[in-house]
Amino acid sequence: RDFVAVLRFQGPRANGMPELHKLTPILGLQQDKGFKVALVTDGRMSGASGKVPAAIHLHPEALLGGPLSRIETGDLIRVDPAKGRVEVLNVDLTGRTPALGPVRTNLSSLGMNMFAPQRDIATDAESGASTLGELDVTK
């Protein structure tokens, strides 16, 4: 079945922006069966993951109340790579309550706990996902 996979809470502050390339083979299998699939996320994927159309690094990230935090199961989503657009059809997202992000007390891995302070101060993807403050990415 055709679908858009929405993977939120993968941005710099929520989850440290992990590499999501392992999704490509799974989504690619659906493409191989003739389905149209795409991925929309506030996370990141390597350039080697180009088989599946993907809108990545969306900001503000879901944890900060970005648009992905308001998308619900069943929403119709159009991904237009040529125009660089993601649209949620027939829905006013501003009227929805943002979904809650992961609860930090449930983090079980050493890495997630150890790097929590860095995630708390990270800038958004548009600003470089830096823990050193705002970076001028235009230079």
Regions found by a protein language model. Name each.
Residues 1-139:
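Feature captures the catalytic cores and cofactor-binding loops of soluble hydro-lyases/lyases
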